[in-house]
Regions:
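N-terminal periplasmic accessory domains that precede
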Residues: 54-57, 76-80, 95, 115-118, ...
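Membrane-embedded beta-barrel scaffold of Gram-negative outer-membrane proteins
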Residues: 266-291, 409, 415-421, 443-500, ...
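C-terminal beta-signal and adjacent terminal beta-strands/loops
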Residues: 569-577, 595-647
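Transmembrane beta-barrel wall of Gram-negative outer-membrane proteins
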Residues: 148-150, 154-185, 194-233, 261, ...
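Gram-negative outer-membrane beta-barrel transporters
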Residues: 318-319, 364-365, 373, 466, ...
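Outer-membrane beta-barrel domain signature, strongest for Gram-negative TonB-dependent receptors
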Residues: 196, 201-319, 326-328, 464-466
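Extracytoplasmic beta-strand/coil segments of soluble accessory domains associated
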Residues: 55, 59-99
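Short acidic/polar hinge/loop motifs at secondary-structure boundaries
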Residues: 99-122, 441
Length: 647
């Protein structure tokens, strides 16, 4: 990182606004021309905000809520008040370089990242199911050009981290890169029976290796990537408030192991007016979980193939045509020595297309459609101890996901757009059967989104202002019904979410940047939901605020560059259940950091996260026949130092 990282915010804002291509648009659309709500953060911005895992993105993206429900493999993600009670079928999907990530791997470390794009609102036309709230698209650095390397180490009262990456030019056409990350969370729970003082510790290792074929004078390009992530954790504690306050418990120490292996081959061919893209991916994840509810083992293998053709038909018309295939095999086993097994196979075929047509120099029209066929088979062995009969069932569904958008470039720096888009959560069968009623399965949950947005640059490029008004109606919502412990996942009635999103970036000088973002909305159950009609949707705060400030001290004061950063975020009250009986009150988290760029090769960052040591819950559930609830809790105050070396 050069010294200009801190001293050229003018360059950064001009680059991002005028020439940044939004890869998640799949049509190479510029940020200032896209007709949907998009937020982008570069690697430098993420570093200054202390974002090094996907769950940290809520520090910089207002309206994004990522919280664990038990452990990080079962996370809840909310955008625009849309979340999912079934953690196997989220409403927000995460992609890394165009490859869909397993639902149990949403909260992964950010390794070798170039930037992160957040698309808000249903994205069913381009991305299919599980994108009702939006998508998070992670774009990594690719080895192009000269050889380089990076190493960094962090130490804090809560964890230690080691990071390393290297890029190598093998010849004029062939490049390779590798990235590694190791994280050790120390833990702070005292286990009374064993007197262990770090009973909630964890270790995680992630690695990525890639080979790029990028010839200068050939239309063909290719990238082969192999990645691995290994988590060994004791994080899944469900504590009473008293146990959390005292940081001690007599519960058995939980265990969680998660291994994820990912393989991807991306190929491109430039035919001139048409660019062909192929993305082939295979991801395998294994989970072993021993917790307060027993023992659970599960494996999931996902094979996917996407083909796309982007064509610039004329100066006024560009088109995208694509096809998608996915085969997902899930295999679970409940309890040590138990014969209860569940195998679910899901096969998906989809065709999709989108066209952008310029009606004139200022107004363009976007039309898109996706047609998806999904077939699912469930083979459950039954569980006599839970009085659940065995079943072998098949289910299939066809889904159409249309989109229409209209954009008006009022001036070179101002754009207004409106859109109607759709999204859905696929139907199928429960991956964790709890009742014989699960044999009937459930149908797709579908959402329709209306949006009016704007994006403008004011005051001689000193102010960036964007926002959107949105309305989302969801039909056939998928909910767990019945008595706790034997609930059935089924379709009920309607839900509705509406609100306002605002983002402001102010650059009063080249050395000072101010960011402010907020979301203000209402999300509630509507007709067809019996006793919960009118209640607020779980994990749907009415208000979120994110504020940040970055200031580079005058360089004459120091040798090198010193930057001061602060980020704060407010989340209003959140309900953990549909009946709205369990909740977390509104809270504010504040982070501070000082970064010292000694020279172009060496930098140091002193940081404190959650400086006020604010306590907050991320999940709660009631103990049956009791007024006491068991909960998961957020991370407390962290103080640490990071040292980074680049060459």
């Amino acid at each position: 990182m050069a010294l200009t990282t801190f001293t050229s915010s003018t360059f950064a804002r001009e680059t991002s606004y005028d020439v940044m291509v939004i890869e998640s648009s799949k049509q190479s659309t510029l940020l200032n021309r896209i007709d949907s709500s998009v937020l982008v953060k570069t690697a430098e911005e993420l570093e200054r905000a202390g974002v090094d895992q996907v769950q940290d993105l809520e520090k910089v993206f207002p309206g994004l809520l990522i919280q664990t429900r038990g452990n990080r493999t079962y996370a809840n993600t909310t955008i625009r008040g849309i979340s999912s009670p079934d953690y196997y079928s989220p409403t927000v999907s995460v992609y890394v370089d165009g490859v869909l990530q397993d639902s149990a791997f949403l909260t992964q470390p950010l390794v070798n990242v170039e930037r992160v794009e957040l698309l808000r609102g249903p994205q069913g036309t381009l991305y299919g199911g599980n994108a009702q709230g939006g998508i998070i698209n992670i774009i990594t650095n690719k080895a192009i050009g000269q050889t380089s390397a990076l190493a960094s180490a962090s130490y804090s009262n809560l964890n230690e981290q080691l990071n390393g990456s290297a890029a190598l030019s093998l010849n004029d056409s062939l490049y390779a890169d590798i990235a590694l990350r190791a994280i050790k969370d120390n833990g702070n729970i005292n286990h009374l029976p064993t007197q262990r003082k770090d009973a909630n510790d964890s270790e995680q290792f992630s690695g990525l290796a890639r080979l790029h074929y990028l010839p200068h004078h050939s239309p063909f390009t290719a990238t082969l990537s192999i990645a691995n992530s290994h988590l060994d954790s004791h994080e899944e504690w469900y504590l009473t408030q008293a146990e959390f306050d005292q940081k001690m418990t007599s519960q058995a120490i939980p265990q969680l192991k998660r291994i994820v292996n990912s393989y991807a081959l991306q190929m491109g061919y430039d035919l001139g007016e048409t660019q062909l893209t192929s993305v082939t991916a295979y991801q395998n994840r294994n989970i072993y979980r021993q917790f307060i509810g027993g023992t659970w083992q599960e494996d999931q293998n996902t094979l996917s193939q996407e083909l796309r053709a982007n064509t610039q038909v004329s100066d006024a018309l560009s088109t995208l045509i694509g096809a998608y295939f996915e085969q997902r095999d899930f295999d679970a086993k409940l309890g040590v020595g138990s014969q209860a097994t569940n195998q679910v196979e899901a096969t998906q075929y989809a065709l999709f297309g989108q066209a952008i047509y310029a009606l004139n120099e200022q107004i363009d029209l976007t039309l898109g459609l996706r047609a998806t066929h999904l077939s699912t088979r469930a083979d459950y062995s039954g569980n006599p101890s839970w009085m659940i009969d065995a079943y072998a069932q098949n289910k299939s569904e066809n889904t159409l996901s249309p989109k229409a958008a209209l954009g008006w470039q009022i001036t070179p720096n101002s754009r207004v757009f409106t859109s109607i888009s759709s999204g859905y959560r696929p139907g199928g069968f429960s991956l964790q059967p709890r009742s014989s009623g699960d044999k009937n399965g459930y149908s797709a949950e579908k959402s329709l989104n209306g949006e009016l947005g704007w994006r403008t640059r004011l005051a001689n490029n000193m102010v960036d202002l964007s926002g959107a008004l949105y309305w989302i109606k969801t039909d056939d919502i998928q909910l767990y019904t019945g008595n706790p412990g034997s609930q059935v996942l089924r379709n009920l009635g309607e839900a509705q979410s509406q609100g306002l999103e605002l983002q402001l970036a102010f650059y009063p000088t080249d050395d000072l940047t101010l960011n402010l973002g907020g979301t203000f909305g209402e999300s509630s159950f509507k007709s067809g939901n019996h006793d919960i009609e009118g209640n607020t949707l779980p994990y749907a705060p009415k208000t979120t605020l994110v504020a940040g400030i970055d200031y580079v001290l005058p360089q004459a004061w120091f040798n090198g560059a010193v930057s001061l950063s602060s980020n704060a975020r407010y989340t209003s009250s959140v309900f953990f259940n549909e009946t709205n009986t369990l909740s977390q009150a509104g809270y504010t988290l504040v982070d501070l950091a000082i970064q010292y760029q000694v020279n172009p090769h060496l930098s140091m960052r002193l940081f404190s996260n959650n400086v006020t040591d604010q306590d907050y819950k991320t999940y709660s559930y009631p103990i049956p026949n009791s007024s006491v609830a068991l909960s998961n809790y957020g991370v407390g105050r962290e103080v640490g130092l990071n040292i980074k070396l680049e060459w």
